[in-house]
Amino acid sequence: MAEVRPYRPGDLADLYWIADAADPDGCADANLVGEVFAAPYAAFSPATVFVAEDASGVGGYIVGTADTRAFEAWAEADWWPPLRARHADPSGRPHERWTRDDVMAWLIHHYRRAPDEAVARHPAHLHINLLPRLQGRGVGRALMTRWLEAVRAAGAAGAHLAVRPDNARAIAFYRRRGFRELDVPPLKGARWFGLGFDAPHLL
C-alpha cells in the first residue's frame, strides 16, 4: 500500500522523473517537463506538495499552490529567468518543425498566466501525476484529499486546474472529486475545471 506523505527535498529527482514519465509526448531532455509542471512548486510552496511512496519508491505526486498569482509573480522573477538562459526560444522556427522539447522551451519563455475566470473564485491550482503501478488504487484520491486540505488551511477559497481535452480518464477523476468545468474562453490544448470550497464536494 502506498503512503501519502509531505514532500521532502530528497524527493525532487522523483518529481522530475515522474513528470517526464507521465508526459505522453516525451522530451529528449528528461528534466524539461518537470522544470515547468513540478519542480517550481517544490521550490515555491513545498508545504503544498505531497508524494505517494510504496515499496518501490515514490510513484506519484501532487504539486500546486494556494495562491496562483503569487506563484506566477515569483516564477517570473526567480524561476523562469535561469531556464530562459539555458533553453532557446523556438519562436523563430516554423511550428511544424518543433519537437516536444521546443514546445516546453516555448512555455518557459511565454508562460501563460492562468485566466482570471479561473483564478477569481479558485485561486489555488494543482498538477497531479501517478505512475501506472499506483493508478486505480485510490492513491490519486488520497493525494487530492491531502492537497485540498492543505490549500484550504492556507486560506484558498477554491482550486482550479487545466487538463488536456483528450484526457478522458483525468477528467472523470476530477469530476468525481467535485471539480466542474469552468466558463473560461477556449484555450488550445486545455479545458479548465474548478472546485469551490464553499460547495459540497467529494474528497
Q: Across the structure, where does each feature detected by a protein language model lie?
A:
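Conserved GNAT acetyl-CoA-binding A-motif
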Residues: 122-124, 151-164
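Conserved acyl-donor/pantetheine-binding loop and adjacent beta-alpha core of acyl/acetyltransferases
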Residues: 69-127
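Conserved beta-strand in the GNAT
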Residues: 51, 57-66
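Short glycine/proline-centered loop/turn elements that form peptide/ligand docking sites
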Residues: 144, 167-170, 186-193
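Conserved acetyl-CoA-binding loop-helix of GNAT-fold acetyltransferases
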Residues: 127-130, 136-153, 172-176
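Conserved catalytic-core motifs of GNAT/GCN5-like acyltransferases
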Residues: 68-69, 160-162, 175, 180-195
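Active-site rim helix/loop that mediates acceptor-substrate recognition in acyltransferases
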Residues: 28-49, 55, 111
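A short beta-loop-alpha structural element at the N-terminal edge
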Residues: 3-16
